[in-house]
Amino acid sequence: MFCLSKGLGAPVGSILAGSVAFIERARRYRKVLGGGMRQAGILAAAGLIALKHIPYLSEDHRRAIKLAEGITSRTIFKVSPSHPPTNMVIIDTEPLSSDEFLSRLESYGVKSIAFGENRVRMVTHLDVSDDDIDSALGAIEKLSRDL
């Protein structure tokens, strides 16, 4: 399965590939579970546009690595894993709780989301630029220095 939303910019949708038997079984499960939509053309159009964004996924991953490496080298916070294989960066916020970390981060103009009591998740995607990564790193660095 290949997801078209999030990083690729579509509001919803995925592509499922497989053998004829697999796809027939998937269709059956979809019907049994109440899936399916009528008038889905507008969403399909967004999916077609998202497919054109596939070449940019490597940029999302490059930015995630830049963010992770910057946090690790310039702040007291740790990142797990240190070299993210995807566009998600998980930050260990200790000695702060995730809520305190997020509150302080927001005071520098950067928003993120808690991912547990002492972890925060940051995600790069189609709408995150290199300048945004630099801003986030600057904010996290200031936050770290203030501790």
Sequence positions of predicted segments:
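Active-site C-terminal subdomain of aminotransferase-like
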Residues: 1-94
